[in-house]
Amino acid sequence: MAAGEQVSNMFDTILVLDFGSQYSHLITRRLREFNIYAEMLPCTQKISELGWTPKGVILSGGPYSVYAEDAPHVDHAIFDLNVPILGICYGMQELAWINGKQVGRGDKREYGPATLKVIDDSNSLFKGMNDSTVWMSHGDKLHGLPTGYKTIATSDNSPYCGIVHETKPIYGIQFHPEVTHSTQGKTLLKNFAVDLCHAKQNWTMENFIDTEINRIRKLVGPTAEVIGAVSGGVDSTVASKLMTEAIGDRFHAILVDNGVLRLNEAANVKKTLVEGLGINLMVVDASEEFLSKLKGVTDPEKKRKIIGNTFIHVFEREAEKIKPKDGKEIQFLLQGTLYPDVIESISFKGPSQTIKTHHNVGGLLENMKLKLIEPLRELFKDEVRHLGELLGIPHDLVWRHPFPGPGIAIRVLGEVTKEQVEIARKADNIYIEEIKKAGLYNQISQAFACLLPVKSVGVMGDQRTYDQVIALRAIETTDFMTADWFPFEHSFLKKVASRIVNEVDGVARVTYDITSKPPATVEWE
């Protein structure tokens, strides 16, 4: 958050209390799609410590049983807010448990599609809805109506699929409206937020720009200066442009060329940010320093840590060279944190097990005694992209595929050398170039080439060769939690493979990775 004033105090907000469901973040996403601001907090949130009043409250699903000894329960103060409440799956069972304990194990678990039968279509929650497919994911069920409630919807296995309090705007549903499998789920969520909570649909990036610029100016004040690392990716570019709009040249961006960036990346980023966007940028070539520390290292986790630690060292050293004018002082560090990062840190089930170390600049705060400023921390990725376009950032940059913090170092499997990096980045450049020529770039979520630590026999002209292997990867995904490989035409892969083998010295063979996530991860390392 950029300044002391919370976004939830500036826009009508729906509070989503998370009981640990894998779908909880989708509730927030769906409401944002209707231009309604929604904020997710753990189910243990004390209402007295909230600091703002929501227009409505949604209780998410969760993997627990409400009757278990260690089951999480909501602060009963939500009922004193006198705002509409919607319980989803576990959230409905929580409402029932509080009002009569009519919850227990079901005769059979219910996972997958079911048919919702609306029996009271006069109720505003189901306005515009009829019998439809909904997504179930529960083992417990209501064994009777909680005190003061009536039934408004059923399914074949759930006689209490939808319930409502007879005198208060408190609703419960057994299914998950937030997932796409519930065909009219979006309608239900909109009915709740707009018709029942009367939340204004004014959460737009157009409104956010002015609000956030004012917050930044209040926080930074008229004299303090800000530094931040940029990578050429959408998050750091949007954050940097927003900061520049707010405080001008008092923001200092630093691009560290670590020797494992994409082909011509440093030069291209400098041209875009300085000439195109007017960002005050320093480019530091530390490629030899990074590559020397990576010499002989093959373990991917060690690569990530070496690059992360070296980055902090280089960034600190270069930041000390910045001398603000008129006795001004650098007091803040800009970071492009997004809302999914915030959700992961505050989710009731806590941060998930670390599969790979993520590259960030968290260590800089303690070392440099700076305060953190995160202007994008309330935004999802799609909102950041929209914001970037409104700020005049080129379309190609705004919709660029993700690139890992450790860069090509984790796309060169095995030891990272200057020569190996060059092979990988040239192959990657050809691959992305052909994807764009074919008009496929925006259909693919992420694509890249990586260099394998094996050699293969080949024939070039009349000569036998024994060179390296490139693996191509392209995936489709909506959330990067799961992903499927992209089904290229064979003719496209043939063209890319031919170009790479003929134009990149040291490559004898090209393969295409057709592994989904899971079991594989998106990156090879």
From Swiss-Prot:
Enzyme Commission number: 6.3.5.2
Q: Where does the sequence pass through the membrane?
A: none
**Is Ligase found in the keyword set?**
yes
Could you tell me which Pfam families the record lists for this protein? GATase, GMP_synt_C, NAD_synthase
Domain of life where this protein originates = Eukaryota
Coiled-coil region(s)? none
Q: What class of enzyme is it?
A: ligase
- Provide the alphabetized UniProt keywords: ATP-binding, Cytoplasm, Glutamine amidotransferase, GMP biosynthesis, Isopeptide bond, Ligase, Magnesium, Nucleotide-binding, Purine biosynthesis, Ubl conjugation
Q: Which PROSITE patterns match?
A: GATASE_TYPE_1, GMPS_ATP_PPASE
Q: Which GO terms describe its molecular function?
A: ATP binding; GMP synthase (glutamine-hydrolyzing) activity; GMP synthase activity
- Would I find ATP-binding among this entry's keywords? yes
- Provide the residue positions that the database annotates as binding XMP: R304, D462, K517, E523
List, alphabetically, the CDD domains matched: GATase1_GMP_Synthase, GMP_synthase_C
GO cellular component terms given for this protein: cytosol
Q: Which HAMAP family match?
A: GMP_synthase (MF_00344)
Q: What is this protein called?
A: GMP synthase [glutamine-hydrolyzing]
The species this protein was found in: Saccharomyces cerevisiae (strain ATCC 204508 / S288c)
